[in-house]
């Protein structure tokens, strides 16, 4: 037994094994990314910052059906509907989302019959104060205008699975 221990110590078996393992990983490509300069590709189903969409003619998509408000498990959505218009449709006068309460489950997006509320591709919306995470209708519409191209592409890619 002593001879075996002496042979291992003499030939530095553990050191050579560890060094060989290190060299194997040293020459492989790095699995890490240099964030924020490099980013992982996102799934079309990624759930990020909320946005309200418009139709191509500029009209808001939201018809004030309040399904998203009803289905939200965190009760983070508040909607107030305006009076009916001449054509019988309604629009929202207030559409607020408390992003502090939101759990990003995507139920609001699934419940919406006209794809008005969506969770967009933006994951970088860090803020300095809690009040900035209370989104009103104007902020949601701005997000929709900002990310419309990516949102439309993601919805089109996901359409066969809906």
From Swiss-Prot:
PROSITE patterns in the record: 4FE4S_FER_1, 4FE4S_FER_2
EC primary class: translocase
Keyword Membrane recorded: yes
Cofactor(s) listed in the protein's UniProt record: [4Fe-4S] cluster
Regions annotated as coiled coil: none
Tree of life domain: Bacteria
Protein's cellular compartments: Cell inner membrane
Task performed by this protein: NDH-1 shuttles electrons from NADH, via FMN and iron-sulfur (Fe-S) centers, to quinones in the respiratory chain. The immediate electron acceptor for the enzyme in this species is believed to be ubiquinone. Couples the redox reaction to proton translocation (for every two electrons transferred, four hydrogen ions are translocated across the cytoplasmic membrane), and thus conserves the redox energy in a proton gradient.
Complex formation: NDH-1 is composed of 14 different subunits. Subunits NuoA, H, J, K, L, M, N constitute the membrane sector of the complex.
Cofactor remark from the record: Binds 2 [4Fe-4S] clusters per subunit.
EC number per UniProt: 7.1.1.-
Native organism: Beijerinckia indica subsp. indica (strain ATCC 9039 / DSM 1715 / NCIMB 8712)
Family statement drawn from the similarity comment of this UniProt entry: Belongs to the complex I 23 kDa subunit family.
Any GO BP: aerobic respiration
Keywords, ordered alphabetically: 4Fe-4S, Cell inner membrane, Cell membrane, Iron, Iron-sulfur, Membrane, Metal-binding, NAD, Quinone, Repeat, Translocase, Ubiquinone
Any GO molecular function: iron ion binding
Binding locations of [4Fe-4S] cluster 1: 62, 65, 68, 112
Domain called 4Fe-4S ferredoxin-type: residue spans: 52-82, 93-122
Matches recorded under NCBIfam families: NuoI (TIGR01971), PRK05888.1-4 (NF004538), PRK05888.1-5 (NF004539)
CC annotations in GO: plasma membrane
PANTHER family: NADH DEHYDROGENASE [UBIQUINONE] IRON-SULFUR PROTEIN 8, MITOCHONDRIAL, NADH DEHYDROGENASE UBIQUINONE IRON-SULFUR PROTEIN 8, MITOCHONDRIAL
Protein name: NADH-quinone oxidoreductase subunit I
Catalyzed reaction equations: a quinone + NADH + 5 H(+)(in) = a quinol + NAD(+) + 4 H(+)(out)
């Amino acid at each position: 037994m002593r001879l075996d221990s002496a042979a291992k110590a003499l030939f530095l078996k553990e050191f050579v094994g560890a060094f060989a393992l290190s060299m194997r990983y040293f020459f492989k490509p790095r699995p890490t990314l240099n964030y924020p300069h490099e980013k992982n590709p996102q799934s079309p189903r990624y759930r990020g910052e909320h946005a309200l969409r418009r139709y191509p003619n500029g009209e808001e998509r939201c018809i004030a059906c309040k399904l998203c408000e009803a289905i939200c498990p965190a009760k983070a959505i508040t909607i107030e509907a305006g009076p009916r218009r001449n054509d019988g449709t309604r629009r929202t006068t207030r559409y607020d989302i408390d992003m502090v309460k939101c759990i990003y489950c995507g139920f609001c997006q699934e419940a919406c019959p006209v794809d008005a509320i969506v969770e967009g591709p933006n994951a970088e919306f860090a803020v300095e104060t809690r009040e900035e995470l209370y989104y009103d209708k104007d902020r949601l519409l701005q997000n929709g205008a900002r990310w419309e191209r990516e949102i439309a592409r993601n919805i089109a890619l996901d359409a066969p699975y809906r």
